[in-house]
Amino acid sequence: MKRSMLLCLALLLALWSAACGETVSLPESLGVNASQGTVQDHWDGHGAMGDGTEYWEIAFSPEDAAEFEESLQTAQGWHALPLDNDVRYLLYGTEGMEEAQDGAYISVNPYLTGKDGGPLFPKVEEGYWFFCDEQTESYTAQGVMERPSQNFTAAVYDSQSHILYCGELDT
């Protein structure tokens, strides 16, 4: 009896340990394979109702980065930097008052923020960006800020440091 109890306990412990080796997978909407990269940071701030932010930071070796960058050039929704204005407002906000395209002046805080309330991604000068509006299943940020809820995935790839920053916002 003791032996079977110990065997069951050992089996339970083995299953529990295997479950702890969770793999981190990026959102499918990115449309790219980042499996050669190394997860530097990942956190999920989604609450019980599914609202919140999730963040991934993936680093690539120079060799793997070249292959990854090549895939970004043809992947749907990916663009060479700089960001378009709608995406820039969502990711970084404005620096004080800015003149918008229609001539009005606006001041916007970033929508996709880190745990400290600041922009989730660092500013990147050279690389690629991605945006997918999960509500409309489109690759444009136009109109997202006017909605009462935002559900989108965004990413910025830094070609100089070979790091992919990805975030998901669900409100």
Which residues fall in each region the model found?
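C-terminal motif of bacterial Sec signal peptides marking the signal peptidase cleavage site
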Residues: L15-A19
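Short, solvent-exposed aromatic-acidic interface loops
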Residues: E168-T171
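Functional cores of ribonucleases/endoribonucleases
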Residues: G77-I163
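Residue-level detector of functional hotspots within protein domains
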Residues: L6, D41-H46, A141, Q150
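Cross-family signature of deubiquitinases and ubiquitin-like deconjugating cysteine proteases
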Residues: C8-L11
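Positively charged n-region of N-terminal signal peptides that target proteins for export
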Residues: M1-S4
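N-terminal export/targeting and maturation segments
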Residues: C20-N85
